[in-house]
């Protein structure tokens, strides 16, 4: 069994189909099919149930996926260990909430990359649930999420304190009236949905139309145009507030607080690049 076989198996398990895995790996589909079949013959067990809807893991496949995740992470860490010489260097895979990536992180990472030019930084965005799953599967080294998160295997550093507000194109209006407009969410999943449901319940506003968008810019533009209202961090609204028709409205005190934490696996091999990242985060004015 080679590491390449495990990467292919991991991709098929995550994507749920041969074609999607082949596309993500830039392989031809027949090659992926053959490698999975060879792996099953080698292990003398079925790893996937094959249906018209795609591929799902058998119990044996689920066990192998856990081992494959760890083995591939160990290989990744071995590569980083071999590169650990001199100044911080090598790959650093970071995930972030889109609002944090737009508002809090540009200056921080500009200074970090200037100080450590040999580090190969990659920054991807997503919602808290997706980013946590990427961390648990060793697909990211660390991520900025709404915290705290309840996973024993994760280390967490509180880095930013935020205030949740309601963004609208109306300067004035009661919270109850504003909440009767359509609510604009991130399409990938909104980390505040439970809190928003509680706000609607508190204000006696029935659930109504939801419109989903893919980016923060799109949500801000839609709010300005009067398409609806959106629950966003105050810093994100202020970041765009030089634009016309964009106003923030305070929420009841019990719904305002938001904490952004930086999370990573407890057993992650801490390269000098990662340690310097942690040191920088802990030194931030809002850090702890």
Curated annotation (Swiss-Prot):
Pinpoint the HTH lysR-type domain residues: 1-58
Query: Which stretches hold the DNA-binding feature?
Result: 18-37
**Record's SUPFAM superfamilies?**
Periplasmic binding protein-like II, Winged helix' DNA-binding domain
UniProt cross-references to Pfam families, sorted A to Z: HTH_1, LysR_substrate
Instruction: Tell me the GO BP annotations in alphabetical order.
Output: division septum assembly
> InterPro entries, alphabetically?
LysR_subst-bd (IPR005119), Tscrpt_reg_HTH_LysR (IPR000847), WH-like_DNA-bd_sf (IPR036388), WH_DNA-bd_sf (IPR036390)
UniProt xrefs under CDD domains? PBP2_YofA_SoxR_like
Question: Which UniProt keyword terms apply here?
Answer: Cell cycle, Cell division, Cytoplasm, DNA-binding, Septation, Transcription, Transcription regulation
Which Gene3D superfamilies does the entry mention? Answer: 3.40.190.290, Winged helix-like DNA-binding domain superfamily/Winged helix DNA-binding domain
- Cell compartment(s), UniProt: Cytoplasm
**MF GO annotations:** DNA-binding transcription factor activity; transcription cis-regulatory region binding
GO CC annotation:
cytoplasm
Q: Which PANTHER family match?
A: HTH-TYPE TRANSCRIPTIONAL REGULATOR (PTHR30126), HTH-TYPE TRANSCRIPTIONAL REGULATOR GLTR (PTHR30126:SF40)
> What is the stated purpose of this protein?
Regulates expression of the cell division protein ftsW, and is essential for cell viability during stationary phase.
Record-stated family? Belongs to the LysR transcriptional regulatory family.
Full protein name = HTH-type transcriptional regulator YofA
